[in-house]
Amino acid sequence: MLYKILEANNGLPSNAKVIFTNTGREMEQTLDFVQECSDRWNVNIVWLEYDELDNQITKSTSALFEPTLDYVIVKIPRWNFDKFEGSERTLGLQMKAVGEVMAIGRSFQEALHKATQSLEIKRNGLGADGKGYKDYNTIINKLKYASWDRVFVIYDAIKIGISLERIYEITKIDMWFLKQYEELSNIEDEIGKYNISIISTDLLLEAKQKGFADRQIAHMLNCLESEVYKKRKENNINRVYKLVDTCAAEFKALTPYYYSTFEQEITDKKGITYTQNESLSTNKKKIVVLGSGPNRIGQGIEFDYCCVHGVLAASECGYETIMINCNPETVSTDFDVADKLYFEPVFWEHIYDIIQHEKPEGVIVQLGGQTALKLAEKLDRHGVKIIGTTYKSLDLAEDRGSFSELLKKNNIPYPEFGVAETADQALKLADSLNFPILVRPSYVLGGQGMKIVINKEDLEAHVVDLLQKIPNNKLLLDHYLDGAIEAEADAICDGKKVQIIGIMEHIEPCGIHSGDSNATLPPFNLGDFVMQQIKDHTNKIALALNTVGLINIQFAIKNDIVYIIEANPRASRTVPFISKAYKQPYVNYATKIMLGKNKIDDFEFKPSLEGFAIKQPVFSFSKFPNVNKNL
């Protein structure tokens, strides 16, 4: 095979962290050392032999040692085309991804499945979820033109009978990869011949070793996910955790950096059956912090900042810290941040198995953005303690209708509103609300699905579209306060006392999403009367929601009256900005309050800021030339 060089670049490539993290290569350590020497002695060059550096994973070998891997890494980009209607979704020379996920498995097939489960695009893996393409022409077109979802389309093509030779002819993807897909398709077909009662242990184990999720197997067997979970537990088909050691167990690794897989049981000379689990659970008090998953619009690196500082605070409180995340771009997935790192999908099945293995005191969900919050309901239902604000309060704030009733009960101003679950209900509400109307679904990220409508035709079309995309959702319709000023406040609450850590005024008018708005800290144009209302409302809402930890509240101000837009009892994207502007470790304080270690009065809040701090978003519209660029 002939290889040709396309380009060569000095410096670190975008996938450098994936390579360094999983091979133990010390490029980052070398660069840090060079920079430190350069800064300290004002020199430009430091010559360092590679064998002078230690392998940071094994701690017992030098960096001058070729990595030996007994695991496979799969990286998949994360796109956000749904935010850009009309955008060109074909991939090409210009990068369009907004983030990425990484997965580790014993085989390519297992790692591929885990990576697709990490994407958070409402897929349970490759196939076996009823969401694949079935139209021949659509599939052929997506194979011809590199589509963002081609990793799924290849599987769909095999399922409808398109030959591997034809797929190779169109895509030029190596036949080895296509045969891996074909094997997965054959396993799905085989499992489909059985039901949950008669499927063999060997076939179920093989499916799990290939990375199929319990949900996918349930889809194949036409049963519940819980039945598959119960079946594999009865047959001792359990996850085991392996070290990412860079040396295939040739040397002892000291870094607690794990991935999951499934193994055949081993029987020793004494007849004892077991599986080799390299992650040994201790008797220490433990806390799990759920990460924020892949970067995308509405959920970026701000939440990773919160997760990292939360982990460090929990460690200061004497807990063994356990981080779960799948984003290779983050600091939280550095193998020396938490006491244990599980590089796993932030996906229910994986999370629950880790919790069953580690038996932590509880799980922190309010630092990982919407990704972690979406798991709160299942954690609560399965008896897992949520650290800080309870699931009941989290759900109350997320449910637009229930939250509006809470405001009404506490005499806090809010725009006229109504809750609709059908288009007919929405049209009836419109008669009493008056246009323009803001339509907002519950339980969404980054303003997804929110829209201002100005007539009944627009309202009906948008509600029908929303309920198709997000079935069984409660939609909040409220009268849009045209011309209002928008502001937001972040606060910490210990359940009895509230400390506001920052109030920001948006420069754009109300109606521009807070993540897209320029904002100033502190406000530059709000009078004392308005500021006092913001403080009073923040105190009332934080206490009414029984908040323990962080809370963010957004306001609309019109005619000197402060109305509530929404409240989120979790870390917001502005917390890192406020913490850095005021030079205060607010996430550290909030985490210690969540853990019950401290109260508000235990901390000295001394924000330090001369002048104003300005938050300004950065857009990438140049990547999407044909989309509407209006905010």
Where are these regions (language model features)?
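ATP-dependent carboxylate activation and anion-phosphoryl transfer catalytic cores
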Residues: 55-211, 234-239, 279-281, 285, ...
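Acidic/histidine-enriched active-site and ligand-binding environments that engage anionic O-linkages
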Residues: 428-438
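Short alpha-helical "recognition helix" segments of helix-turn-helix
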Residues: 166-167, 216-218
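ATP-binding N-terminal substructure of ATP-dependent carboxylate-amine bond-forming enzymes
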Residues: 230-233, 242-412, 421-428
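Conserved beta-strand termini and adjacent loop/short-helix elements that scaffold enzyme active sites
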Residues: 21, 48-50, 324, 389, ...
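ATP-dependent adenylation/nucleotidyltransferase module used to activate substrates
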Residues: 1-57
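Amphipathic alpha-helical
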Residues: 55, 219-255, 455, 462
